[in-house]
């Protein structure tokens, strides 16, 4: 997903891309791609987990990047951004709609806001077994909320189906991608391997 996002940004955005704010930087997969393709002058990285800053010691040490740990929905971010980007994080937000409005105030006049998120079918098998999951917005709902503040340059939905041989492989995938959408409930092999009848 990060590669696709990076390619799309590379197609639409001018280079170098001045100031970039990345929401939900995680381990830095998209960050590294942005550095290679858009060559930002300044990069502000955000993740809810302070521990993720250790993935960026080279960038933070050079002064090219700063790291702000905390909840992106309430954390104060610097204004004057050329690009605000988020890959696979907005589905965790209580109100993406309010965040869209806020991002508009952080962007320069000709700035861009780009994000990926998950659709309604994301992890539906896990949700059916656990009885828990996130509220995913449809593409139409997202577009409606965005049109209030932005001119939409590109919006599309893509279905990516992953298959796994065992429930354990599912757990490993969820752990390594950080997209396990089960609220306040431990996800265990017992939950996943229960037969559904």
What role is predicted for each listed range?
Residues 108-169, 177-188:
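Conserved catalytic/acceptor-binding region of the Class I
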Residues 190-196:
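Residue-level detector of conserved catalytic or cofactor/ligand-binding positions
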Residues 83-96:
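A short SAM/SAH-binding and catalytic strip from SAM-dependent methyltransferases
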Residues 1-16:
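Conserved alpha-helix/loop element of class I SAM-dependent methyltransferases that forms part
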Residues 73-84:
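A short acidic, Gly/Pro-enriched loop at the edge of an enzyme's catalytic core
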Residues 19-75:
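Class I SAM-dependent methyltransferase SAM/SAH-binding core
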Residues 97-112:
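A short glycine-rich, Lys/Arg-flanked "PGG" loop and its adjoining helix->strand segment in the class I
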């Amino acid at each position: 997903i990060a590669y696709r996002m990076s390619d799309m940004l590379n197609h639409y955005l001018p280079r170098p891309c001045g100031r970039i704010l990345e929401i939900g930087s995680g381990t830095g997969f998209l960050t590294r791609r942005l550095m290679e393709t858009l060559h930002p002058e300044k990069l502000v990285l955000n993740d809810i987990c302070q521990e993720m800053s250790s993935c960026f010691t080279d960038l933070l040490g050079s002064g090219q990047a700063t790291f702000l740990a905390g909840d992106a929905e309430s954390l104060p971010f610097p204004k004057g951004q050329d690009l605000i980007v988020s890959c696979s994080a907005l589905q965790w937000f209580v109100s993406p709609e309010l965040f869209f409005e806020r991002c508009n105030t952080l962007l320069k006049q000709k700035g861009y806001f780009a994000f990926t998120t998950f659709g309604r079918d994301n992890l539906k098998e896990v949700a059916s077994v656990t009885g828990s999951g996130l509220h995913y917005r449809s593409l139409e709902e997202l577009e409606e909320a965005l049109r209030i503040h932005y001119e939409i340059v590109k919006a599309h939905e893509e279905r990516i189906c992953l298959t796994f041989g065992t429930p354990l492989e599912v757990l490993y995938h969820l752990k390594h991608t950080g997209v396990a959408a089960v609220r306040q409930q431990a996800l265990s092999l017992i939950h996943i391997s229960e037969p559904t009848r």
